[in-house]
Amino acid sequence: MSAVAPHPVPAPALAAARAALTERAPLVQCLTNSVVQTITANALLAAGAAPAMVDNVHESAAFAQIASAVLVNVGTLDDDRARAMGLAAQSADRSRTPWVLDPVAVGGLEFRTRVARDLLASSPTVVRGNASEVLGLAGAGSGGRGVDSTAGAEEAVEAARELSRRTGGAVAVSGVVDVLVHDGRTLRVSGGHVLLTRTTGAGCSLGALVAAYAAVEDDPLVAAAAAHVHVAIAAERAAARAARPGSFATAWIDELDAVDADAVRADLETSGRLA
């Protein structure tokens, strides 16, 4: 009888990552889009991290050297933002600061697609996007409908693996079931709630949380998985007491704060969330 293959991400590692985030309060530099700055900062604060929206061309590189992690989100892009993002990513790469690329709406628009592909040269620790964005970034698709995906996560698995090989980092594809890949490993994370898709900035906040976890966890697959699990548990708990988008958004931030390492551990013992 053949031995059962070990799980690519042991559940105890995710609970340990949650505890580490709380204990270490990483400083996360966010070069993110103007639509989502408030919810992104609030999500980081709720999770126990410290946000810093240092995104100008004069300071982005210097701050990336002292930050615990960096988020680069190309959602609202112009020439100055693109330059600041490039400088921050290069600085993070040189300083070995973990950084996350969120290729918002990449694939269908030439400018942001070129900028995002250029950023890959700075070896992001994690790329996090929906299926259409990952396909577009890898050159295997033409993008989705704006920020919304027109493809399922499973359709982007091979593109994600190719991006992971190219960058050396993990790639996380969001969907009904999220698919995460790195170094020959593939992990699926289920759960969450449909109200996340009706909350402006929920996905962008997830990218910031991936960065926060990458600051306290050296394995990029574990870091990405910890963020996805944290967000999913918080969303399910929020939806249990808030049935509409406005109240859900507030409840979700509350639950990001409430979900601690013990909650992660208890959930993973019974939920079957990981596959």
UniProtKB/Swiss-Prot annotation:
Tell me the keywords, alphabetical order: ATP-binding, Kinase, Magnesium, Metal-binding, Nucleotide-binding, Thiamine biosynthesis, Transferase
Its EC number is 2.7.1.50
- One Pfam assignment: HK
Keyword Metal-binding listed? The answer is yes
Where on this chain does substrate bind? 53, 201
Which SUPFAM superfamilies does UniProt cross-reference here?
A: Ribokinase-like
- Record field: catalytic activity: 5-(2-hydroxyethyl)-4-methylthiazole + ATP = 4-methyl-5-(2-phosphooxyethyl)-thiazole + ADP + H(+)
Sites where the protein binds ATP: 128, 174
**Organism domain of life:** Bacteria
* Known cofactor(s): Mg(2+)
EC class name: transferase
| GO biological-process terms attached to the record | thiamine biosynthetic process; thiamine diphosphate biosynthetic process
Does Kinase count among this protein's keywords? yes
Which pathway does this polypeptide act in?
Answer: Cofactor biosynthesis; thiamine diphosphate biosynthesis; 4-methyl-5-(2-phosphoethyl)-thiazole from 5-(2-hydroxyethyl)-4-methylthiazole: step 1/1
- Give the transmembrane region(s): none
Q: Name one GO molecular function term.
A: magnesium ion binding
Function text = Catalyzes the phosphorylation of the hydroxyl group of 4-methyl-5-beta-hydroxyethylthiazole (THZ).
* NCBIfam families, sorted: PRK09355.1
Among HAMAP family, the record links this protein to:
Thz_kinase
User: Which family does the similarity line name?
Assistant: Belongs to the Thz kinase family.
Q: What is this protein called?
A: Hydroxyethylthiazole kinase
